[in-house]
Amino acid sequence: MKPNITFILCCFLLLPNLSKSAEKKVYGLNEYVRLIDIDLEVPAKLDTGAETASLSARNIKYFKRHGERWVSFKLAIDGSHTRVIERPLEGIDQIKRRADDRGSHDRSLYSNRPAILLTVCMGEASRTIEVNLTDRSAFQFPLLIGSEALKRFDATIDPALRYAIGKPRCASIAQKAE
């Protein structure tokens, strides 16, 4: 009789963990994401092995506005994105470089990337996340969303799925103004 009580107690201890996993949303390895601040939809790779989020950008320039540090850039997605985007600089992220990204004379293990805050929408959920800027034009996906941002979405990633939650359904800035 005693082993049955132990088993029942163990089951009750596991119940809170089961309810937590039920609350998480299952996303695919790739999802469509709306960058609400920029009013643009892009395909993204959801990568639990990366810590930060990265957006493909070029012509990155730092400047000051009213004593604050800002960054300007153009999206490095395709030739049609020529608009200059300006955002407050949130900070500088140090990103560990892959060995094949370093030249024979370049010994630095980290690259410094400007980081900004962007509001992103996946499915019906929108969150403000930190995104660093780097030229990702050699990659298939212009946006990589890492584990820190995925935590904010309470996301569980199923790598067997692609575009599991469909198109973003959050209101854009233009829709909110109406």
PLM segments and residue spans:
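Bacterial N-terminal signal peptides
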Residues: F7-P16
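Bacterial N-terminal signal peptides that target proteins for export
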Residues: M1-F7
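Pepsin/retropepsin-fold aspartyl endopeptidases
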Residues: S21-E178
